[in-house]
């Protein structure tokens, strides 16, 4: 029986060719007025998840994305 991939994980994460997990930077939904411009600028783009977080995400995408 094939395992299903979690749809929410498909939308939020990507895998690199080497198997690292990439996601968008967190903390940019609201409340940007309080933050410095450099902080907002640094939160653009994507980030590579750490080892423990990537292990959890990979459980939900058994065959990759």
Curated annotation (Swiss-Prot):
GO terms for cellular component: cytosolic large ribosomal subunit. It holds the Pfam family Ribosomal_L35p. One of its GO terms (molecular function) is structural constituent of ribosome. Keywords: Ribonucleoprotein, Ribosomal protein. One of its GO terms (biological process) is translation. It comes from the Bacteria. Belongs to the bacterial ribosomal protein bL35 family. NCBIfam families: rpmI_bact (TIGR00001). This is Large ribosomal subunit protein bL35. It comes from Wolbachia sp. subsp. Brugia malayi (strain TRS).
């Amino acid at each position: 029986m094939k395992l299903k991939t979690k749809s929410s994980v498909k939308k939020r994460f990507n895998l690199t060719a080497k198997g690292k997990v990439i996601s968008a930077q967190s903390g940019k939904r609201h409340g940007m007025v309080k933050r410095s411009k450099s902080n907002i600028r640094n939160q653009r783009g994507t980030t590579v998840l750490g080892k423990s977080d990537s292990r959890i995400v990979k459980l939900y995408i058994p065959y990759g994305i």
